[in-house]
């Protein structure tokens, strides 16, 4: 039988002991289907949404959005309707909304699932940037070829449990 419960610790703290808004200050997640995490109909509002919920001052939000747009090279996605974006563009906006909050830990569920080869290369560069920034990145992914030179460890899952671990460094 698959495990149906467990405990998650981040920096030695059980995250169940903290309200979700506190956890979201240092852990950001991007779902496999970005549509399921959108709360707005335009890209600019979506990118700022998390910061608004954490009551960032307006100036800090503007600063973080500018940095996000520049770092992720997504100026072409600003000021647009979510409904006119491709799957890969939606994935980039979902990631940008998390990146703008600058969490120390990123949880990514199948981040390459909606992406073509060029967009996967963009994703790889973005992950490289996060690694250089000292961020922790946990990725659930079927396509691992693009991650091989980026990751420190790989854990293989089978039937809901870790079946193998490899150190890549």
Which residues are covered by each model-predicted region?
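H-loop/switch region of ABC-family ATPase nucleotide-binding domains
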Residues: 141-142
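Conserved ABC ATPase "signature" region
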Residues: 59-77
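Conserved ABC ATPase signature
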Residues: 81-85, 89
